[in-house]
Amino acid sequence: MGKEQELLEAARTGHLPAVEKLLSGKRLSSGFGGGGGGSGSGGGSGGGGLGSSSHPLSSLLSMWRGPNVNCVDSTGYTPLHHAALNGHRDVVEVLLRNDALTNVADSKGCYPLHLAAWKGDAQIVRLLIQQGPSHTRVNEQNALEIRELKKYGPFDPYINAKNNDNETALHCAAQYGHTEVVKALLEELTDPTMRNNKFETPLDLAALYGRLEVVKLLLGAHPNLLSCSTRKHTPLHLAARNGHKAVVQVLLDAGMDSNYQTEMGSALHEAALFGKTDVVQILLAAGIDVNIKDNRGLTALDTVRDLPSQKSQQIAALIEDHMTGKRSVKEVDRTSTAQLPLLSNTDAIAPMSQGSMEKTVTELILHFDTHADEEGPYEALYNAVSCHSLDSTASGRSSDRDSMNKEAEATGTRAAGVRPRERPPPPAKPPPDEEEEERVDKKYFPLAASEGLAVRPRIQSSAPQEEEEHPYELLLTAETKKLGTTDGRTEDHRQSGSGRSQDSVEGQDGQVPEQFSGLLHGSSPVCEVGQDPFQLLTAPSQSHPESSQQDACHEASMQLEEPGVQGTEPPQPGVPDQSKRVGLPAGLTALASRTYLDALTHTVPLRPAGAEEEDQSGPRSRAPPTSKPKAELKLSRSLSKSDSDLLTCSPTEDATMGSRSESLSNCSIGKKRLEKSPSFASEWDEIEKIMSSIGEGIDFSQEQQKISGSRTLEQSVGEWLESIGLQQYESKLLLNGFDDVRFLGSNVMEEQDLREIGISDPQHRRKLLQAARSLPKVKALGYDGVSPTSVPSWLDSLGLQDYVHSFLSSGYSSIDTVKNLWELELVNVLKVHLLGHRKRIIASLADRPYEEPPQKPPRFSQLRCQDLISQTSSPLSQNDSCTGRSADLLLPSADTSRRRHDSLPDPGTASRADRFRVQEEPSETKLTLRPPSLAAPYAPVQSWQHQPEKLIFESCGYEANYLGSMLIKDLRGTESTQDACAKMRKSTEHMKKIPTIILSITYKGVKFIDASNKNVIAEHEIRNISCAAQDPEDLCTFAYITKDLQTSHHYCHVFSTVDVNLTYEIILTLGQAFEVAYQLALQAQKSRTMAASAASMIETKSSKPVPKPRVGMRKSALEPPDSDQEAPSHASVSWIVDPKPDSKRSLSTN
């Protein structure tokens, strides 16, 4: 395979000399063996000398014959695939001369012709069609045979193939506007009526993406294409939906029926719904029937009449005027561009019923989602990291791997098996179309018409599957060659398809509601909403004007541009129309009254300081008024004229900031500057009174918030996420323990948590956290003076009933013990592995009255570990049975000292116990391990890899491949491990995928953790592991033997890593775990012996000097010598061994 790999690489990189050299030997051997000729004309299959001759000499020649010209890599690419994709014409010619087959499909069913057409290389396309030894069937589709496709007729729906898109080369060329390739394919009598899996013809794709020249070519060659429409769509509908007015005009001039009706209605429905005013005018001028209804019984006018954007009202006026003939188009344009008066009174919204508006828009969204599978044929082209998304993804940015990965994460998809730094260049830029020059004002539409396609979206959950099925996905693995000058100037040929430019991303996140993002996929929506959906349409409460000002009048009052106009002045004629920003219908605007604007000057702003910058980059969803505590509300407010004078902020500065509010920092700076003069004391007192009165109003609104908040808490996490437009993260939150809306408050869910669970988009994280602030915080334990009566009732209040058994079995049976919990214990002792559940518990214990844990290392004698031989067969998750605790680190210092005091009840001996403890501490501050050379004489190293504390209080994790396990019938130490390694290596040679696990090693044992989902698979206690060794034949492979306590059988578990050094470190860490466990056992025995000695002393006369203990104990155990003498004793085992059998009982580790 070495030569074939070289050939594949040379073809991919365009190394012509290397290709010729590798194939030169093949031509010689082919001619000598009697195979096909050098030009490849002799073999019917183009195989040449590839085993076609039955001469015995051919088998001998195979040993030195050149590489197979049709060899394939893991993606199914032949050298011809690589050369065609990357535009290496000379290499293609050489491969064709050497009998390269042109009709070999890759793993996604693509021929080299598909790749060349997608790339837009007309010369290579002609080469593949005309010069190949086997004439490429130009009409060949990715998977289904032609006879199957033609069985039901070329224009009827047919069977969808699951592993391809059923696209011809003409589809690929038409979609990207490769005019020359389309010409070449049409010259070969390519059938342009074929449809892909989503029933789209090449003409549909060209109309969808605005490829004007391709549309003209296809219509000129096959005028009958205009009659090949389906109930799903027509070219006219697709072009109208995306505002390609030139394409619309060409289709109408060619005779396409403008009144053709699909499930979504007429082309006028499409253009009106997606705000394409120019297309609406063209269709009206062409005499389209405005009374056509869609499948919901709505006309185009009904669809846009109630949508609250100026663009929709403009289109509605166009249609109405066309029906009545009252005004001309120019008059409508002049009317639409006239500025509307400033909307200040939100009572004007009242005639617009929230229920009717919400119902209308929701029905549109639900209808699109219902037909998502049929209507979203190119969803994978926008979301998946595939061949079609290689074109810089409509951003104009450098198309490196980082930007692509970021783009894939934003859509929730990522291509599997993508090699780093390998990416083919995008196809050559198609000729600019007339439609691409059209731009829509982004003030009203976040996505320009040419930057966003209104392709019907799939539901989010289907995106990964679609990506997996896309036949061009693996093109990412095709090339390492970097883009040259195209990187800086490449524009996506589907720029209107992805709509992911930086500007449009900001606009989309900041202005378009998430419910519409799935509807449009980049097309400019008519319903322009500045923040959370339908929030702007809510009728204000008369008793609480603050809530209504949040979305309507607050921004309007903050945008006064005249320097001399203060908050108490009525709006001037020069003030820009703010109703456009809040997305209200033009007919609902009203003149602002002086009284209402007066009230604005005393309104607490519902947007914190710095929100202006935030609006430019992220979602503008703001918390409801009562989500802030009163004290916080006092820090951010709008200022009246007198207040702004007090703070010496000029009106010009206010206008340039675009807001009448002042941040806390600005207020505090002004206050410090003014407080130097006593004359301002009365003014500041007045300000405080104003702020206090504002707080009272907020208190009233909090009662109302409780009612609406209770409804929110009854939602599921999925419903809550859907309400904020981030339902794609439901699985991430649920799988990580954020599974209850009642416990998603700001003291539970933090930005670091969202980053850890895989939410990489900072704007989405910000929006989640903003929504979480409106949820109630988890109440601290005993916040109301009444603590739960039991641990089960406390866990039940947190919705964590599943952990009751774990808490009780681990010794946490009372609320007092729970108050001392730390996260370390939650993970290692109580096995609360879900992050959201741990954060929920910690938030409940936030205000517990205890001291901080000690910073110095704990005393290991307090571990009170049992002898290894006396351990039960309980799993590693069981806590130490002596105290229910694992270390002093987990105990408050007061509780630790109290426990020591209780163990020595005689006051007369307390001082002696203290003296012994003080003497003991210097030698116990650090556990001393024997070096590897003493612990295991065969070990060639002199030091361990980790500190002992790492294996006691934490764990050492290593990623490895698990090859399998084998029953050991005759235990022979390392010989058994070698036999098992050899057998497992052989059995896994043909496995396509070897499972990856994480070995988590502690002094207690080894855990198997699934690397994909972090679930614990199995646990092996350290006392049951008898031998661990590397495989001498493959040093990346290692194994260890365990004993099954139930059956008494021994099993050898075999693993492999990618690095020899890593394997050696794992073996050494296992050995250190043995040593740590052994030394802790010695420490435990020493502690028990000392306790027995102290007890015997208490039984004697407490007033007399301490006698020498009567047990066979060395004096150093009772009165430890200096630390320099104690350290060697830790390194040796003999210092604690005593001839008496009692002292030997717990030292066996076999």
UniProtKB/Swiss-Prot annotation:
Residues recorded with modification Phosphothreonine: T335
ANK repeats: 75-104, 108-137, 165-194, 198-227, 231-260, 263-292
Keyword Transport among record annotations: no
Keyword Amino-acid biosynthesis: no
InterPro entries: ANKS1/Caskin, Ankyrin_rpt, Ankyrin_rpt-contain_sf, PH-like_dom_sf, PTB/PI_dom, SAM, SAM/pointed_sf, SAM_ANKS1_repeat1
GO molecular function, one term: ephrin receptor binding
Compartment annotation: Cytoplasm; Cell projection
Single GO cellular component term: cytoplasm
UniProt region (Disordered), positions on chain: 33-53, 391-583, 602-666, 872-927, 1096-1150
UniProtKB keywords: Acetylation, ANK repeat, Cell projection, Cytoplasm, Phosphoprotein, Repeat
GO biological process: ephrin receptor signaling pathway; negative regulation of ubiquitin-dependent protein catabolic process; neuron remodeling; regulation of ephrin receptor signaling pathway; substrate-dependent cell migration
Modified residue annotations for N-acetylglycine: G2
Purpose: Regulator of different signaling pathways. Regulates EPHA8 receptor tyrosine kinase signaling to control cell migration and neurite retraction.
Subunit architecture: Interacts (via SAM domain) with EPHA2 (via SAM domain). Interacts with EPHA8; EPHA8 kinase activity-independent but stimulated by EPHA8 ubiquitination. Interacts (via SAM domain) with EPHA6 (via SAM domain).
Protein name: Ankyrin repeat and SAM domain-containing protein 1A
Organism: Mus musculus
Lineage: Eukaryota, Metazoa, Chordata, Craniata, Vertebrata
